[in-house]
């Protein structure tokens, strides 16, 4: 049986919107619209991606596991779906939307009244195969942390040359991660 602590999961998930709001709101666009190069995300794009996941990924997949198990695979996730959804919106609008959607999703998650055995329930991912609800929820948290790190890395990238020789001591500039397709 999975040893999943839902309180620990929701504690972090609940903080991500405020973390991003504190980091990004009211910054000059050079910080939020600049990326790391061709085919990479800006902080604005990452936020749009997180919103798209709130709408189409985490809770819909949790519901699918609970309702259908492995008999009905998850819908594929459109990694670029955020481009349509973010078009014409401002960063403050995206920050507000992310906060609202995350709050709604966490409320929905709480109303499921999950029991310990529910975390072992299985669903089918279109690329990864069989996954458990526990794995999905742990991935949701880790996905948030990945993108908080990514936003920090994107922003640090703006000063990659300016820091001069100190770059060797700044791990965020040495990170092998990238924003392009995996």
Residue ranges of model-derived segments:
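Acidic/histidine-rich alpha-helical segments that form the ligand environment
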Residues: 16, 79-121, 131, 135-143, ...
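Short acidic/polar alpha-helix capping motifs at helix-coil junctions
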Residues: 9-12, 25-26, 69, 86-88, ...
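Short, contiguous alpha-helical
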Residues: 32-77, 120-182
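Amphipathic, non-membrane alpha-helical segments in soluble helical-bundle scaffolds
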Residues: 3-14, 40, 44, 91-95, ...
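Alpha-helical bundle segments that constitute or directly flank the non-heme di-iron/ferroxidase center
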Residues: 2-31, 51-64
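Charged/polar positions within long, soluble alpha-helices
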Residues: 22-25, 29, 63, 67, ...
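Intrinsically disordered, low-complexity segments enriched in polar/charged residues with Gly/Pro
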Residues: 10-11, 19-21, 27-28, 85, ...
């Amino acid at each position: 049986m999975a040893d999943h602590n839902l309180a620990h999961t929701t504690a972090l998930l609940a903080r991500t919107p405020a973390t991003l709001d504190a980091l990004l709101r009211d910054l000059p666009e050079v910080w939020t619209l600049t990326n790391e190069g061709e085919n990479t995300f800006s902080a604005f794009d990452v936020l749009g991606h997180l919103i798209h996941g709130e709408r189409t990924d985490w809770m819909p997949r949790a519901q699918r596991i609970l309702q259908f198990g492995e008999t009905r695979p998850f819908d594929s996730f459109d990694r670029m779906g955020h481009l349509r959804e973010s078009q014409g919106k401002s960063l403050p609008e995206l920050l507000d939307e992310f906060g609202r959607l995350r709050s709604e999703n966490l409320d929905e998650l709480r109303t499921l009244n999950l029991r310990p055995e529910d975390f072992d329930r299985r669903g089918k991912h279109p690329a990864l195969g069989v996954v458990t609800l526990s794995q999905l929820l742990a991935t949701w948290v880790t996905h948030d942390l990945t993108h908080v790190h990514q936003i920090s890395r994107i922003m640090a990238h703006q000063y990659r040359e300016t820091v001069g020789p100190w770059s060797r001591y700044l791990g965020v500039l040495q990170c092998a991660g990238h924003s392009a397709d995996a």
